[in-house]
Regions:
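Flexible "cap/lid" loop of the alpha/beta hydrolase fold
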Residues: 129, 137-167
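Conserved alpha/beta-hydrolase "acid-adjacent" motif
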Residues: 246-252
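Active-site loop/oxyanion-hole signature of alpha/beta-hydrolase fold enzymes
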Residues: 74, 83-115, 119, 285
Length: 297
């Protein structure tokens, strides 16, 4: 893949990133290109790394392109085949999940361990219900259940109607206002993450992409999940949360545990919504221990 740092507009966004952080990420982007497949008339891009006997379907967050996940992809690919898709501009969760299933079929993967963090956790919860036979296990990280009757859902619907009227620049600012509160403190250690965040928001995502992200969020909140949804599904579930994550206060964490009473739950401390960055090794260890336990059961 072409060196993104040769683009002055993009390189400027990474100017404050120390070379020790930037160079491994730069090499990842150069050495690993997206694969492409058309599913239902929609073109999908995705990473396909590793060659282990089992596969992981890694579902990225709201910004739709799995650049944030690069270091996890490399480490998980040491033991598993890893499929990490970008999200195209489709407006429903069903369409998104149908595309994901199409990628797996195209790659000859019958079942995968499905892992979703934040917005990717929304997608994962729909996927396991729509394609239970393709879901070997479910890892949900820093995400939440649906609240179809909540006032916040009504606000999301209004926001989507307004967003359609806005130019792309205003739409990016609106999305950043929503996401900024989930970002960690801007320290030197987090410089790369903030560079990636800026590139995704300012360069990578089009107006159509952002509108589809919002539309799928509204669509997700219309679902009504119950603890009985997966009663006949034989897979196991891991839920990871952090006690000070603004998206999952205590009442939401309790709702989540009631929705998935069979789940193994791990609670991190002090890292908010950014545990996968701030405690990357510990984050991966919890997931790997869970998957290793499946093989030992």
């Amino acid at each position: 893949m072409a060196d993104f740092m040769l683009e002055p507009k993009i390189a400027k966004l990474y100017r404050d990133v120390p070379l020790a952080q930037l160079e491994p990420y730069r090499q990842f982007r150069i050495e690993h290109d997206f694969k492409h497949v058309t599913v239902g008339g929609v073109t999908w891009e995705y990473y396909d790394l590793g060659s282990g006997p089992e596969a992981r379907l890694m579902l990225t967050g709201a910004l739709a392109i799995p650049y944030f996940d690069w270091h996890h992809l490399l480490r998980f690919a040491e033991t598993h085949r890893v499929i990490a898709p970008c999200y195209p501009a489709v407006d429903t969760m069903d369409a998104l999940c149908d595309g994901l299933a199409g990628i797996l079929r195209h790659e000859g993967i019958e079942r995968a361990h499905v892992q979703g963090g934040s917005y990717g956790g929304f997608v994962a919860q729909i996927f396991v219900r729509r394609y239970p036979a393709m879901t070997a296990s479910l890892v949900l990280s820093h995400t939440q259940p649906t609240y179809p009757d909540d006032e916040g859902t009504v606000k999301l619907q209004r926001m989507l109607r307004l967003a359609k009227l806005l130019p792309a620049g205003a739409l990016r600012r609106m999305l950043s206002l929503s996401l900024n509160r989930l970002m960690p403190e801007k320290t030197q250690d987090m410089a790369l993450q903030f560079g990636i965040y800026a590139e995704l928001l300012r360069v990578c995502l089009s107006k159509a992409d952002i509108l589809s992200i919002l539309a799928r969020t509204v669509d997700y909140e219309a679902y009504r999940f119950t603890p009985d949804d997966l009663v006949d599904w034989p897979g196991r579930i891991l839920i990871m949360m952090t006690e000070n994550d603004r998206t999952t206060p205590e009442e939401v964490r309790e709702d989540f545990k009631r929705l998935y009473p069979q789940a193994q739950v791990h609670l991190f401390e002090g890292t908010g919504h950014a545990t996968s960055w701030e405690q990357a090794d510990a984050y991966r260890a919890v997931i790997n221990d869970f998957l290793n336990g499946l093989n030992e059961a």
